[in-house]
């Protein structure tokens, strides 16, 4: 699947706090989107959403960039493992 990478930094002094701060902003503006702050040495990353298609992620990316133009330059769609909700009564 796909997610939107909003932030990635390896500055050990500020990266974690920046990722968590930006996560809070996105959660307030888009509560329906899951957020994921991860640390894979040496990078702290903030990724958003669980999208099955690149097109679906791209549409969400447009909305995120409109809401947060100051962060738009760093935002991009990335391939990632995603969480898929399976609704009761259906099997996959």
Predicted regions and their residues:
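Acidic/histidine-rich, surface-exposed loop or edge segments in extracytoplasmic proteins
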Residues: 1-10
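Short glycine-rich or small-residue beta-strand-to-loop segments that form or flank ligand, phosphate
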Residues: 5, 47-49
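Extracytoplasmic
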Residues: 14-45, 52-92
């Amino acid at each position: 699947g796909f997610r939107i990478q909003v932030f990635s930094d390896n500055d050990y002094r500020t990266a974690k706090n920046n990722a968590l701060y930006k996560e809070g902003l996105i959660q307030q503006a888009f509560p329906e989107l899951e957020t994921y702050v991860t640390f894979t040495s040496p990078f702290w990353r903030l990724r958003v959403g669980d999208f099955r298609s690149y097109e679906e992620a791209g549409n969400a990316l447009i909305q995120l960039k409109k809401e947060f133009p100051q962060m738009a330059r760093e935002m991009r769609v990335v391939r990632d493992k995603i969480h898929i909700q399976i609704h009761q009564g259906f099997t996959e």
